[in-house]
From Swiss-Prot:
Gene from which this protein is expressed: proS
A Gene Ontology biological process term: prolyl-tRNA aminoacylation
Name of the molecule in the record: Proline--tRNA ligase
Pfam families assigned to the protein according to its UniProt record, in alphabetical order: HGTP_anticodon, tRNA-synt_2b, tRNA_edit
GO molecular function: aminoacyl-tRNA deacylase activity; ATP binding; proline-tRNA ligase activity
InterPro entries according to UniProt: aa-tRNA-synt_IIb, aa-tRNA-synth_II, aa-tRNA-synth_II/BPL/LPL, Anticodon-bd, Anticodon-bd_dom_sf, Pro-tRNA-ligase_IIa, Pro-tRNA-synth_IIa_bac-type, Pro-tRNA-Synthase_IIa_type1
Main location: cytoplasm
Subunit structure: Homodimer.
Organism of this sequence: Pseudomonas putida (strain W619)
Assigned protein family: Belongs to the class-II aminoacyl-tRNA synthetase family. ProS type 1 subfamily.
Its EC number(s): 6.1.1.15
Keywords in alphabetical order: Aminoacyl-tRNA synthetase, ATP-binding, Cytoplasm, Ligase, Nucleotide-binding, Protein biosynthesis
Domain notes: Consists of three domains: the N-terminal catalytic domain, the editing domain and the C-terminal anticodon-binding domain.
Length: 571
């Protein structure tokens, strides 16, 4: 491809509303253009990258035995009402009416549609297992679209759904898809981690997320430094570093604390070590009108996903209002604690191992210091309530936990029978009796992968693509292309490289475009291999080669270029 026949839409300045690197560089490199909030047009340069992601995804899905389909973006409300998600999904679901006033939505996901397809097409266990996928545009009406493609409203996604007569078959396909996802992200040259995850709004019983590691990531990815254990922050089990509770050394005492509305103030103004403090958080209970106290150490954070799974706690988690606290306890949020608290208490594992600690006295501006379990109050129910912190013991007993930032690019679920039961999707089993199908669900954010790859690999000059993802593998840059000797050598090399199967972008812009601008554009776009053709080099029988990640260029004999690139470029 020649730049004279291509839309080379690079920009020198960074748009003011672009915050994250991938958004900035995709705009500057001429890969996307913003149409409206959260909506982007893919330009030819960006689309080449996305098509490469799609190709790898398609190859690995096909190799794993999945069958490609294409479902409508617009879905009838009746299906979502059958599953119960029409109201549950919330305002992110874009709803609309047709001219006949029938309700529809723009699909953010396709569990209902695929289950409807399966219940109409499948009748016997002999047709199972069946795994179908599509690569299609999705829409979620995000309240605050941001970060370019990382959190847009419209995006490209690969979603697959599998159907099974039993759990063993589901597990087999799930494991196959887990491996397929690992193959995909490995082939794309990404540094990634598969982690145990919560199933979230999709539902189901078992899931894994696939995260590309990047400092700009929105999610915490937790993994052991000595084993294969890995989980996201919602799922990671928090194991206390302490193994036993120390014996009491202090007496219980009531202290006036007018300057301790927060943990930070309690530590700063009263000299209490933060690991000797607790947070008493009051939430609404599962039973109407009931409140429940959740207690974590002062230097730890409540994990709301874990808390909402407790049978006594309302899901989703809702914090009690100040008025509710006053009515139930008679004190404000900064003065609460488990001693003499007229509510059911659930404490974190780390709290159960504390001694000589401080708590709110359930009286405004008063705290108890020197509190000890069993001596001053009984140990209530103990549960895993907190987020892990770096250095915690790994739950598998091997090593300690490391926390990195990650960008979620894939998620696989074992849905079980959640949707098949709701939509009555069943077949005749081997014994001739109806069997409700078990389902799996497997998603990859195709457009998000492109942005995540940039977040993982860039420098101050622009994007650094690997060979698998680059829009073009080779940038061929002639200097003084208007001269016969340079033009003839360049055109001949371009023809040879193209015939050999390389993806080449020939920068044939005229002399009004300086060599510096040409080099800067190719580095901004991130093309991994650059060949420079100049009359001076040709006089010596050489070309100039430079890899995008290298500082210095090297002379390359003209007659060795093809052999060199065939060995260097990964195809």
């Amino acid at each position: 491809m020649r730049t004279s026949q291509y839309l080379l839409a690079t920009q020198k300045e960074t748009p003011a509303d672009a915050v994250v690197i991938s958004h900035q560089l995709m705009l500057r490199a001429g890969m996307i253009r913003k149409l409206a909030s959260g909506l982007y047009t893919w330009l030819p340069m960006g689309l080449r990258v996305m098509r490469k992601v799609e190709a790898v995804v398609r190859e690995e899905m096909n190799a794993a035995g999945a069958l490609e389909v294409l479902m409508p973006s617009i879905q009838p409300a009746e299906l979502w009402q059958e599953s119960g998600r029409w109201e549950q999904y919330g305002p992110e679901l874009l709803r609309l009416k047709d001219r006949h006033q029938r309700d529809f939505c723009v699909g953010p996901t396709h569990e209902e549609v695929i289950t409807d397809l399966a219940r109409n097409e499948l009748s016997s266990y002999k047709q199972l297992p069946l795994n179908m996928y599509q690569i299609q545009t999705k829409f979620r009406d995000e309240i605050r679209p941001r970060f370019g493609l990382m959190r847009g409203r419209e995006f490209i996604m690969k979603d697959a759904y599998s159907f099974h007569a039993d759990q063993a078959s589901l597990q087999e396909t799930y494991d196959r898809m887990h491996q397929a996802y690992s193959n995909i992200f490995t082939r794309l040259g990404l540094d990634f981690r598969p982690v145990q995850a919560d199933t979230g709004s999709i539902g189901g019983s078992y899931s894994h997320e696939f995260h590309v590691l990047a400092e700009s990531g929105e999610d915490d990815v937790i993994f052991s430094d000595s084993s294969d254990y890995a989980a996201n922050i919602e799922k990671a089990e928090a194991i206390p570093r302490e193994t036993a509770r120390l014996a009491p050394t202090e007496e219980l005492r009531l202290v006036d604390t007018p300057d301790a509305k927060t943990i930070a103030q309690l530590v700063e103004n009263y000299g209490l070590p933060i690991e000797k403090t607790v947070k008493t958080l009051i939430v609404r209970g599962a039973e109407e009108g009931k409140l429940v106290a959740l207690i974590v150490r002062g230097d730890h954070e409540l994990n709301e996903i874990k808390a909402a799974k407790l049978e006594q706690v309302a899901d989703p988690l809702v914090m009690a209002t100040d008025a509710e606290l006053r009515e139930a306890i008679g004190a404000g949020a900064g003065s609460l604690g488990p001693l003499n608290l007229p509510l059911e208490c659930i404490i974190d594992r780390s709290v159960a191992l504390m001694s000589d600690f401080g708590i709110g006295a359930n009286i405004d501006d008063k705290h108890y210091f020197g509190v000890n379990w069993e001596r001053d109050l009984p140990v209530p129910q103990v549960a895993d309530l907190r987020n892990v912190v770096e250095g915690d013991p790994s739950p598998d007993g091997q090593g300690t936990l490391v926390i990195k930032r990650g960008i979620e690019v894939g998620h696989i679920f074992q849905l079980g029978t959640k949707y098949s039961e709701a939509l009555k999707c069943q077949v005749l089993g081997e014994n001739g009796k109806p069997v409700v199908l078990s389902m799996g669900c497997y998603g990859i954010g195709v457009s998000r992968v492109v942005a995540a790859a940039i977040e993982q690999s860039y420098d101050d000059k622009g994007i650094i693509w690997n060979d698998a993802l680059a829009p073009f593998q080779i940038a061929l840059v002639p200097l003084r292309y208007e001269t016969d000797v340079v033009r003839e050598a360049t055109d001949k090399l371009y023809a040879e490289l193209t015939a050999a199967g390389f993806e080449v972008l020939l920068d044939d812009r005229d002399k009004k475009t300086s060599p510096g601008i040409k080099f800067a554009d190719m580095e901004l776009i991130g093309i991994p291999h650059r060949i420079v053709v100049s009359d001076r080099g040709l006089a010596d029988g050489n070309l100039e080669y430079k890899h995008r990640t290298e500082q210095d260029a090297q002379a390359l004999p003209l007659n060795e270029v093809l052999t060199f690139l065939q060995a260097r470029v990964r195809r």
